[in-house]
Amino acid sequence: MSKLSIVKVRTDKDVNSFVLLAGGEAAVIDPGEPAAKLVGQLDKSKLRYILITHGHPGHLAGKDALKAATAAETGMHVADAKAFLRSADIYLKDGDELELGGFQLRVIHTPGHTPGSLCFLLGNHLFTGDTLLAGSLGKQAPETDVRQQLYNVLSKLLVLPLNTAVYPGHGSATSLEAEVRTNPYLRPR
């Protein structure tokens, strides 16, 4: 199996964008601006996917420029495409899998922060956008509430191994184990 590299790129609006490199292929999760910072991290790999965790501007501001530079396919959930008047080449849903350089990238739908919030699981690496942050949850969409988001985190994310690394859309990386121990939203009341 090929080697996996994960590069965190801090983009405008304090958004964490991630470049995943495996077997000569790449994916970008949450392409902020400037897109040139992301292109510079591709290291001769072919960009296959531009993946959006949710439709807020900072998390996809570089999508169109990155697509123009690379012709990669864009993917997001249809609920956020409709809610934020966005478009994508692929409308992703819970359980979808994308192949990337010999690895399987699994899509996990976690509505709460936005109706179409997605997380992406690659091996034991979980990219959570604003669904789960270190020590917190992302602010909920007006049409949802913290209980729905918390239910999705508990039922879809905390069933993963506790040693799963978590890469949120803002702030520092963490792990599911650390979040179970320290995140006040995840502790029993």
Question: Residue ranges of each PLM-predicted region?
Answer:
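Active-site HxH/HxHxD metal-binding segment of metal-dependent hydrolases
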Residues: 12, 26, 33-104, 137, ...
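Metallo-beta-lactamase
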Residues: 26, 104, 109, 115-189
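A generic fold-level signal
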Residues: 1, 12, 100-102, 161, ...
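Hydrophobic residues at beta-strand termini and immediately following loops
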Residues: 9, 92, 110
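A short helix-to-beta-strand connector/capping loop
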Residues: 2-4, 87-88, 162
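Conserved beta-strand hairpin/beta-sheet module of binuclear metal-dependent hydrolase folds
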Residues: 1-45, 119-129
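Short secondary-structure boundary segments
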Residues: 31, 54, 78-79, 122, ...
